[in-house]
């Protein structure tokens, strides 16, 4: 009952106070009027130690206080704090500033005092001031270490811990409670009851433990029941940590399976698309192969036709016919075998009047005498190279001899030669009978007419006989 009263007194001041000094903590704990531990019964050895402390010298007193208040002399295996390698949440956090945890500084000296008087003489860190009587151990109860440690890292601050005000109590208030209850009964159930009273709804400092459905299911499956209020014991923390680890592993496995399923579905879709595309390409390849085979067959057929056409030899008769045709096309225009038939028809031939300028002038200046037909006597053939020396018998022959003896004989001869060439060219197409008719003597001039007028039928009658004969011979030679 005394422990409950002390716990009720220290709930609000200790949690709300600022970081205190060691002496203030001692005064707060051991003051006879207002101290928290004034009603707690101490062991007999502890009372004797306090009486002896009054009579000690200042040096012994300082040594005793250093033994009590020295942080380095405290037992590292204290059951009130979790070791650094434990699974609790306190061990995972970085060591905090001593000013942030004032209750611990108040509990360490008390524990140290309790331990100093339980050791034998000459063996403990504190010397015994009663040489014959050892310090008896004060009655205390073994408290589980897990009643202090709280894993804050494993619990989400959004779901488990609401935002605390500036004056919220520290999580180490439980150690002060244990210190207060250390002199009381040793039943663990009383400690749990005191903790529930300390963090109950009436105190205003309790924090509820919020569990998800999965956590509740796994806890029920494990057969563990967790309290709804904080803090938890170390065993409960380990169980909760294990449950949450399982939940995280389950969630990660579900996400992994989901991603794997999505990846496999994507691969299957791609595989189906690739399979359809592959089938389409195979159909196209088969179609192209068929077209290629048909084209190859057509090419072979064309090659066979070309080989057959080139292997046939050229016939000799065809070559001879081509040569004869070409020769005939070259030779036939110069032969003209149809000229006689053309000359026989009188309508096909049109006489052409050919005049010599010199002969025309001389003939125009003279008046031909009347000549009767048949009066011309044929004389000897005149020699072209020798001039005539005298007149020949017959008027026409004499006239032609005098004409040939004029000084312009050379020019006349050249003109006659030119006329002969023209006449020769014009008489190539005449027949032999026509040329023989020209050789016969005919009068050059009609009786009673002046000048040379050649009738249309006999356009060459003005040419001398010997010249006509020569022209006829030349024409016959060509034929």
UniProtKB/Swiss-Prot annotation:
Membrane topology, from the record: Single-pass type II membrane protein
Glycyl lysine isopeptide (Lys-Gly) (interchain with G-Cter in ubiquitin) cross-link, renumbered residues: 290
PROSITE patterns: BZIP (PS50217), BZIP_BASIC (PS00036)
Region (Basic motif): 241-270
Predominant location: endoplasmic reticulum
Disruption phenotype: Knockout mice display decreased triglyceride clearance from plasma resulting in hypertriglyceridemia.
SMART domains: BRLZ
Pfam families hit by this protein: bZIP_1
Keywords (A to Z) from UniProt: Activator, DNA-binding, Endoplasmic reticulum, Glycoprotein, Isopeptide bond, Membrane, Nucleus, Signal-anchor, Transcription, Transcription regulation, Transmembrane, Transmembrane helix, Ubl conjugation, Unfolded protein response
Tissue: Expressed in adult liver (at protein level) and small intestine.
Comp. bias intervals (Polar residues): 98-110
Entries under SUPFAM superfamilies matching the protein: Leucine zipper domain
Annotated stretches, region: Leucine-zipper: 281-302
Function: Transcription factor that may act during endoplasmic reticulum (ER) stress by activating unfolded protein response target genes. Activated in response to cAMP stimulation. Binds to the cAMP response element (CRE). Activates transcription through box-B element. Activates transcription through CRE. May function synergistically with ATF6. In acute inflammatory response, may activate expression of acute phase response (APR) genes. May be involved in growth suppression. Regulates FGF21 transcription.
Protein name as catalogued: Cyclic AMP-responsive element-binding protein 3-like protein 3
The species this protein was found in: Mus musculus (Mouse)
Gene from which this protein is expressed: Creb3l3
